[in-house]
Amino acid sequence: MASKVMAEEADMVDVLVIGAGPGGGSAAIHSARAGLKTVVVEADPSVGVPVHCGECLSEMAVQNLDLEIPDHVKALDVKGIRVIFPDGTEKLLTEPGYVLEKHLFEQWLMDEAGTLGSTLHLGHKVTSMERIYNSENQFSNWKIDGKGENFPIYCKAAIDASGVAGASSKLLDMGTEVEVIAGFQYEMTDVENDGYLDFYLWPQYSPHGYVWMIPKKGERANVGLVTTDKKGAIKYLDKFIQDTYLDGKPMVNPQWRDQSVKVRPFGGTIPISGPREVTVEDGVILVGDAAGFTSPLFEGGSHLALWSGREAANVIAKAITTNDLSKASLMAYEAAWKKRFPPYHKILKGKTALYELTDEEMSTMARCLPDELGNMSPFQKLGIGLKILVRKPALLTKRVISVLLSFGYSRAKHFGW
């Protein structure tokens, strides 16, 4: 919907950020830091609650984003990832990072944004977005309405960080829907760890997905999975716990949940089909899950959300100085993420090939890999190909090289976590 009526300058804010997750928090920080009058609206009554993900962030992400994360939001410093294949073969991807208390991390981001001058409205859900054009039929600003006492809000630009549902994609009909996967987890206790995140590629417990054990201090851990079988997800998770060393270990409510309620899993849906076809339109930029930005193999999204929120804010700040918030002007954002993010089509191709392998084929491939997957030399990669050729040449016809490339592009330096 469009209108020729312009808002009063006194009522106008520069940027409205929709959603207070990691993408929204990052966008708010960098918009406010650029001197823009910034407002954030969050549909939920609290920032960071409920938690939707495994809560991990690599040290490389922290460095890439120039973050100084306070200790109180960290649940554990970790060494990297251990991938466990169907026959029990284990391979390490050693790259340091953190398990976060994600609700505290997101609250810290919004506190940082507030310190810089951003305003936060909780319990505010966007239900309509109306573009306003000037007398020359050029985009001028937005009138954004919804449920909440501070609506309507007039703004020059909007950053959609509303998660996989993508408020603006639905309200503005910005293209195709994204494919999603279900992710759920329990918080458990009495779970020992050696500082690695455990990712189990065990299809019997997580069809077209994987199971994880993400450790926290105090012998706590997030134990969860992602699977394309949304209806059966919790049943698969319960079965995995029952059949492994986790059987009998206590399940507890996470810190952010009312401790008087019955213990139950938490999570949600995650985009897995790659970026949306359209991430920019006149006056609006999509970031994080709203843009379809997750690493497709292991569904890591926080690094991508934080980076895209920062980039969106910087592009909009520049566009406001030139008084040009057209799609053509904001396409600098799309050019930036396409240049910086990994080749999604290659990761998706490898992921498809991975889940076409039988358990035996997956394990055979794993036994051909070095014990440490980080920083493999070209000579080592050649050796892997030769081992596969000797042990099970049929694997080469099953696009196993694409699988290995997908693993490589899921590392922290490629925004994997």
Question: Model-predicted segments: where are they?
Answer:
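Short, well-ordered coil/turn residues at beta-beta hairpins
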Residues: 19, 161-162, 287
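A conserved beta-strand/loop capping segment in the N-terminal third of enzymes
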Residues: 58-110
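FAD/FMN-dependent oxidoreductases across multiple families
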Residues: 99, 125-128, 231-315, 320-321, ...
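C-terminal helical "tail/cap" subdomain of flavin- and related membrane-associated enzymes
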Residues: 317-417
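N-terminal Rossmann-fold NAD(P) dinucleotide-binding loop
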Residues: 24-25
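Glycine-rich FAD pyrophosphate-binding loop
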Residues: 20, 32-51
